[in-house]
Amino acid sequence: MALTISRAQYVATYGPTVGDKVRLGDTNLWATIEQDLLTKGDECKFGGGKSVRDGMAQSGTATRDNPNVLDFVITNVMIIDARLGIIKADIGIRDGRIVGIGQAGNPDTMDNVTPNMIIGASTEVHNGVHLIATAGGIDTHIHFICPQQAQHAIESGVTTLIGGGTGPADGTHATTCTPGAWYMEHMFQAAEALPVNVGFFGKGNCSTLDPLREQIEAGALGLKIHEDWGATPAVIDSALKVADEMDIQVAIHTDTLNESGFLEDTMKAIDGRVIHTFHTEGAGGGHAPDIIKAAMYSNVLPASTNPTRPFTKNTIDEHLDMLMVCHHLDKRVPEDVAFADSRIRPETIAAEDILHDMGVFSIMSSDSQAMGRIGEVVIRTWQTADKMKMQRGELGNEGNDNFRIKRYIAKYTINPAIAHGIAEHIGSLEVGKIADIVLWKPMFFGVKPEVVIKKGFISYAKMGDPNASIPTPQPVFYRPMYGAQGLATAQTAVFFVSQAAEKADIRAKFGLHKETIAVKGCRNVGKKDLVHNDVTPNITVDAERYEVRVDGELITCEPVDSVPLGQRYFLF
């Protein structure tokens, strides 16, 4: 006999369903559930008097020898994902990977159970009611200056760090390069202790090929070209030749001073080959004043770093001070001051907001401790989305913010994964991928996750007093969980390396315990492959006034005095 309950009662018990709108934090963004994969009346819920019990929603006979039995299931959760959309489902995990998005349960007693989502006695359950699940974030612009960055990253919902460095050396303060085989080995060994996935860039600044090849063979998943080492046409060509040969990505911070050529010369050196441009607006560095034009090319994968996101009344002043420190400039030297002033342009920063909203800029990253904040990639992405809704109105005619939400979440999940040849493994919650999952309460979305799951094991979470009688008494703050302890760290995070390094078995050579996964397909991608962010309009920049035009139309916006997801979330 069917039981009819009110929509309000259903939402209170099982969470929102199709058509329900959920506000993201204190932004003005509302996500509407597009599809519900659960069977009404057969929802799985754990707890006293609930349905996940032996013989009910939990099988009384299925053992883990059955490959369809889950290790971990998140039930009744709202999913926000660039590829899956905004849906309601159970998430099934086995052996550290997502094996099902659908209906979990006991097929002996329930209809429509997804075939490989059986709940058994060996299954752990987490209630996803009133939570939002997203894929772990990917930050592709990491200066590995200190190991403590990883903690701040994972606490913000970022689970993969890609970049370079060797610690607080001046070369690392300024550039994201791990130079040479010796440092590559030692940085992999050091990163064994980090609770996040890691990939390292080699130093791409070399006009001959062998010094680049040896870094790729030692484990670098890509090469980074930086102007501080000389971003010349010869260097660019050499790095891209090695990239094409060894199937890795090249990231570039172009020549702010235009010493060895202008943007047109850099694009000529790139010669149509795919490349990942960092801080493509230019405040973080790059051809002044028109590096932003690079975003119009189909072979360019354009990224932002987060300090310019979004454009606020404090953005300009903050950048001048940051720049002087990060690039070892002296306020007493006129040439250094001129260098700094040439990079910080309100006009192009304002345009960057709009280019993100149009889907022209495709990736968001941090520039950690080197003119960017590792813990604010997610926050600033959603602050930008909210500002653009306020200033530009709705995108599309859906009557909700779903398209804008999917466009923006793609910028720090699936698109950086595509750019670096790791989308087969991370970047979305699709079946088959590593179960790096972030769970949020809607009111804290984008700011403070409830739980961060790494490879199917809870690694970080909000946790109260460990001596309390229940988990919730204050002080509540982020603490490492069992997935980030002891030998488990090596089982819950991976290293992304080149195919050459995988073939050379650097895991055994360096004595590593974490799984190494080779990147692939880095040279076959283009702007067209970047999800919801593949637009390639004509962009022009006025060389004197710095005004930016897209297809002939001036694009600009005002800085704001305040942003959501701000101080009210950080009083304690």
Swiss-Prot record:
Its cofactor is Ni cation. Binds 2 nickel ions per subunit. Gene3D superfamilies: Metal-dependent hydrolases (3.20.20.140), Urease, subunit C, domain 1 (2.30.40.10). Substrate binds at residue 226. It catalyses: urea + 2 H2O + H(+) = hydrogencarbonate + 2 NH4(+). NCBIfam families: PRK13207.1, urease_alph. This is Urease subunit alpha. It comes from Haemophilus influenzae (strain PittGG).
